[in-house]
Every structure is written in C-alpha cells, then in structure tokens.
Amino acid sequence: VITQDVNQLTFTEATFDRVVSVEMFEHVRNYAQLFKNISHWLKADGLLWCHIFCHRFLQYPFEVQEEDDWMSAHFFTGGLMPAISTFSHFQDDLKIEQQWQWSGQHYEKTANAWLENMDQHQKLLTPIFEQIYGKDARIWWQRWRLFFMACAELFGYEQGNQWLIGHYRFVKR
C-alpha cells in the first residue's frame, strides 16, 4: 500500500498486473493524465479496477466558495465528484471493459455504521484525534461526525438513485 499524492507518483513502466483504486479518483482533476500514467505502469495484459463515489449525471468540483464550505475545504480539497459516465470520456490509454453501478444506499449504510462506531468508541478515539489534530481535535471530531451524516443523507437520497457507487474494470488499449 502506497500513500502519496498520485500526481507525483512514479513507477517503472510495465510494473503491475493489477492496479486497484478505492475512492481516490474523486480527489483528482486530470483524469486523462492519470489514466495515461496508469496505462504505462500496467503490464500489457494488466487491469485497473476503480471504486468511486459519483452522481448519476452531474460532475461537479469540490471548491471552497464560502467560509462555511467545510466539506470541500477539509475532505475533498481540489477534487471532483464524477458523474457515473465521466470515465467514458477518458479512454485514450485505458478502455472500460466492464462497469457496475450500485445504489447509494450501500454507502448510506456504511456512513451510518462508521458514525455509530465512532460515537461508540469516542473514549478510545479522543487521544488519537488529539494526537493528529492537536488543539482542533474537538472541531475535527464534529467535522467527521457531520461528514458521515452528510454522506449518509446524500447517498440515501431518492432511495440511493442520485449519488451512486461506480465500479469500473479497465484494460489497456
């Protein structure tokens, strides 16, 4: 597992049989370059599998437009909410071999479970939040709680048919 800004990531060509991305593409804006890079990193028969959050038809940026725009400022800085069809417009280097669309209600349940788990373990988590966030630990506790609540509401909206989960399997061109 590598944790790094994907825009700065480099590997030798034809290094990987498989690349798996879970909830990373929402933090990227230059899909064309990222798909090109990944295609170089994959072996000839390599596959890319992506899991993303997406909207059923809208793509929109996460941009801080007002002082109280906390989700864009703290959780998705500089990223995009892709539409379910967004990746179909970026197939110069990789081609979508198969695509799956899942109801947002799955993530609604996940976000609610994370919130419940966080609340049940507050005493255990508080020192960790203090270590990571310092004097802002209480603020960040509330941000995370609101994040889970907001995600649960968004992804559960209209029975999970607006904000979705997209899975994609790509092959090299």
What is the role of each PLM region?
Residues 17-30:
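A short SAM/SAH-binding and catalytic strip from SAM-dependent methyltransferases
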Residues 54-56, 60-165, 171-173:
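Substrate-binding/catalytic lobe of Class I Rossmann-like enzymes that use SAM or dcSAM, i.e.
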Residues 51:
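Alpha/beta-hydrolase-fold catalytic nucleophile elbow
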Residues 7-19:
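A short acidic, Gly/Pro-enriched loop at the edge of an enzyme's catalytic core
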Residues 29, 43, 91:
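Short conserved AdoMet
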